[in-house]
Structures are given as C-alpha cells and as structure tokens.
C-alpha cells in the first residue's frame, strides 16, 4: 500500500545573507595563491557559502567553471551560484548545478529602469522597478523596498520578488512573491494567470493543476484576507 504524506513540507519566501565573490581573473594559479592565504580563515569556520559574481566576463566559455568551483571548495568556500547581468550565464549555471542570479544593478540598467517617487515633504517613497524584457527560466528579479512591474512574459522557473506589490502585464508562468519583507497589504496583479507559485508576506500557494476557467489565463489579483491567500478575477464583484 502506498501512503502519501500531506503537508510534509512548506514552501516560503526567504532571504539569505550570502557573501559574493567578484571574480577579476580566470588564472587558476593566481587564485590558488590568494586562496591559500585567505582560505585558512574560512576553513576554520567550516564551509562558507558564496555567490560567484562573474560580471567582468562576457562569455561562460572564458572560464573553467568546474575547476573554479572545485578550487574554492578545497579552501572552504562553497560556490552556490553565479551572478551576471546576461541570461546566457543561466545555462552555464544549470550545467554545474548552480543557482543563477541576475545582477540587480545591471539587471535594472539592461532590462528596465527604477523610478523613485517622493512624497510631498521630499522624503523618498517606495521605488518601482520596471522590467520590459521577458524574464526567462532560471532568472530572478528582486525589487528591494519597492514595487515590481513586468511587461514581458515570465517563463516557468523564473522568479519575481518584491518587498511591495508585483504587476505582471503579460503571461505569468513562473513564481511571484510579493511583500517579501512581511508587508501583508502587498498584492500581485497578473494579466494572464498561469503561475507555478504565488506568495504574499510568506503565505504561499502552488499550482499543480490549472485554476478554474474564470481564473486560468485570465487577469487576476492576489491578496491576503484573514491570513489566507485570495485569488480573484479582476473586474469581478
């Protein structure tokens, strides 16, 4: 008899404090010399996780990623993912079982723009990150302390995160996590609802099956009511 365990685990949004290594050379011998000295500090602390920032390199072929990951690992520095502003690096990250992170500053410059609004007294209000290009599988976009607006399609396996609201004016097939810092008033607005997972302030729902016809591939809004996620068609009473 096969037994299924329900609620065996929960999926929640989280933020990890992970150090970033900005790589300036592809020379493994030069890196080895530095790591022999620096690595002792990390070896004493056990394995320390890092994201490898490869922004200074245009193409994955310019680096021996397998050797780099192995080199850092030998010195107590575990590479969890790659960071770059160009999506071509996502495939390289997947090849070596690494996460891929879009460089936030470069991502904003290449894909969209940031608008910082001001209140009447001149104080900075919530800023808005605008992404006009498609967000592809493996990419993550994070709007810190503000709202996120996306006008391009969001692929399955892509992730949108905002401390405020999320607006998606295109088909949404990935994950959307609003109110990432706990804002329970945050909302998610989707033009064509096909998401894998949605979350508001850590309360999530994943979708293993299509929603009812009045919601699937329709404009919807997602919000919290009484600590529960509510998904409703936009324009419905």
From Swiss-Prot:
It comes from Neisseria meningitidis serogroup B (strain ATCC BAA-335 / MC58). The keyword Cell cycle applies. Keywords: Cell cycle, Cell division, Septation. HAMAP family: MinC. One of its GO terms (biological process) is regulation of cell septum assembly. NCBIfam families: minC (TIGR01222). Cell division inhibitor that blocks the formation of polar Z ring septums. Rapidly oscillates between the poles of the cell to destabilize FtsZ filaments that have formed before they mature into polar Z rings. Prevents FtsZ polymerization. Interacts with MinD and FtsZ. This is Probable septum site-determining protein MinC. Gene3D superfamilies: 2.160.20.70, 3.30.70.260. Pfam families: MinC_C, MinC_N. Belongs to the MinC family. It comes from the Bacteria.
